């Protein structure tokens, strides 16, 4: 098969005709080599920059708003068609500013929250109506009657407040501190008192203590009777 490549002499002659690949001159147009999308971006950039300059100078005029006029219903026109025409004529306006949480909550949850608030207010109103006025005695007799308030209870006094005072220089202790006697309740262990009753139900501690007391009382009475019989 004959070779399809050109001879060396032919290739060198073609290169001499083309010449060297120099950079394009200022007069030559290079726009044809750019892609169209890149050209659009350049045009947009130039447009925005020119607009900013005009705004700074104050040459840019505000656009006049369209005067829609009064929209009236045409004779023989349906209400649905008229409403569509009105919606098209009215410009769409979006809310500015941060969105609220209530806009995204479900309608059912909103109703539940509203019902709870109403019930709470109703209960408070009933309590206030049923609340007896106890101030009439204070008005007539002049005696102060303490009424329960919703204020928080005051804090109890600090038992270690005395330790905060620093001793003076050269102070000596005359006697050891006297500690108050602690009232310790004697723990009574209940013996022979079952934890479960005849029905198989567990008994509480208070119930078992009461049964233990009754058992001891009966034992003492029985012993007294036996002593009297022996005599």
From Swiss-Prot:
GO terms for cellular component: nucleolus; nucleus. Keywords: Nucleus. Residues 53-67, 109-119 have a biased composition (Basic residues). It is found in: Nucleus, Nucleolus. Residues 9-27 have a biased composition (Basic and acidic residues). InterPro entries: C607.02c-like. Residues 1-33, 47-68, 93-132, 147-178 are annotated as: Disordered. It comes from the Eukaryota. PANTHER family: UPF0653 PROTEIN C607.02C. Belongs to the UPF0653 family. This is UPF0653 protein C607.02c. It comes from Schizosaccharomyces pombe (strain 972 / ATCC 24843).
